[in-house]
């Protein structure tokens, strides 16, 4: 038995995640102390990376997910380089229960975007005169949980601050 398009009925209800587009929204690389920053350093620089994920609903089943990655490298308080990347994708998600949709958008979609963003950053840092910066894999499940806990704590403190 089929559902009219040749597929069995259970296949019509299978969850689907499609990448419709991927693109760089913003890319910035700064090497403010060049050429001095390109000289061999006595010690390894300190590298600080911040990652954030945001999502916007475009249509009933389409979402734009943006992976924001910012980084700075400094040595003894002197900025060596900094970068900022906003890398986004448009995803179509079908046949996913509503309670699973938010985690899917905020975990799986950025996980699919990350390798591309990682390559863009490695190339930008290399083109800035430094060895490529290979970002470690990101635990998007842990990042999602941290953000949910932070939102819950903010909501709880907002409720406590309301006058009775």
From Swiss-Prot:
GO terms for molecular function: unfolded protein binding. It is found in: Cytoplasm. GO terms for biological process: protein folding; protein tetramerization; protein transport. One of its GO terms (cellular component) is cytoplasm. It holds the Pfam family SecB. InterPro entries: SecB, SecB-like_sf. The keyword Metal-binding does not apply. SUPFAM superfamilies: SecB-like (SSF54611). Its main location: cytoplasm. Homotetramer, a dimer of dimers. One homotetramer interacts with 1 SecA dimer. Belongs to the SecB family. This is Protein-export protein SecB. It comes from Rhodopseudomonas palustris (strain BisB18). The gene is secB.
